[in-house]
Amino acid sequence: MAYVSMKQMLETGVHFGHQTRRWNPKMRPYIFGARNGIHIIDLQQTVKLFRIAHDKVVDIVAKGGKVLFIGTKRQAQEAVAAEAGRAGQFFVTNRWMGGTLTNFVTIQKSVDRLKKLESMFADGSINRYQKKEILLLERELAKLEETLGGIKNMDRLPQIAFIIDPHREDIAVKECRKLGIPIIAVTDTNCDPDVIDYIIPGNDDAIRAIKLFVAAFAEACMEGEAMGKDHKGETANAEEAMQKAAAVEAAAEAAPAQ
């Protein structure tokens, strides 16, 4: 288990919340105190709650589930795209398109368009168009890739969402809740924890803090995937052993009595 330690959280500034005047009173249970007008988050709770969320991700991925990483703020975009991609999971780092989850069928039509354009540029069939048309199609492809590139292989809804800053990603939160998709979120002191299933109280603005959590959940995904493969291997071996035993038993029954 690759848990994040309290030392790592302190070093990356996870404990720094927002200004005390910019807070959601519902976050009071997760606040240790205040210093120079800034709320300080109780990292003992963050460590405990992180482990719960981490184990949930491992379990879901081990059972064949997928995670959707969401982080459209500038500080999160690079880390979310890199780490989710490394773990083979889905991600949204540009603007969240309303209906990405709740209007999944319609979004898939745009994804199909993206894949078609990619194919046309890859196999050279795009060259049957005039240069001006090709330029327009290049721009369309770039825009679709920017918006949908991280979910173009998402052929079904994710089993869980991991969100950086649920206050900013409120539309994504609403869509997940409407569809019953559990939410894990790095939740700063200005957020509403009531709409999050697995809250991780922490700084959702500092790049180092964001990278710490995103990388940790990418590792959780890969750990779950490895566990799933091991389980499939064990199941296959058990089934093979049962088949061999059945064959031996059948052969023994078919043999003439001495």
From Swiss-Prot:
User: Which CDD domains is this protein grouped with?
Assistant: RPS2 (cd01425)
Q: Which InterPro entries match?
A: Ribosomal_uS2, Ribosomal_uS2_bac/mit/plastid, Ribosomal_uS2_CS, Ribosomal_uS2_flav_dom_sf
Specify the superkingdom.
Bacteria
Give the UniProt keywords, A-Z.
Ribonucleoprotein, Ribosomal protein
Region entry Disordered: which residue ranges?
Answer: 234-258
UniProt cross-references to PANTHER family, sorted A to Z: 30S RIBOSOMAL PROTEIN S2 PROKARYOTIC AND ORGANELLAR, SMALL RIBOSOMAL SUBUNIT PROTEIN US2M
Encoding gene, per UniProt annotation = rpsB
| Pfam families linked | Ribosomal_S2
Q: Where is the composition biased (Low complexity)?
A: 236-258
A GO molecular function assigned to this protein is: structural constituent of ribosome
Q: Which HAMAP family match?
A: Ribosomal_uS2_B
GO cellular component terms, alphabetically, are: cytosolic small ribosomal subunit
Would the keyword Glycosyltransferase be found if you checked this record's keyword annotation?
no
Could you tell me the Gene Ontology terms of the biological process aspect for this record?
Answer: translation
- Name the Gene3D superfamilies on file: Glucose-6-phosphate isomerase like protein, domain 1 (3.40.50.10490), Helix hairpin bin (1.10.287.610)
Protein name per the record: Small ribosomal subunit protein uS2
Which residues, if any, are the signal sequence? Answer: none
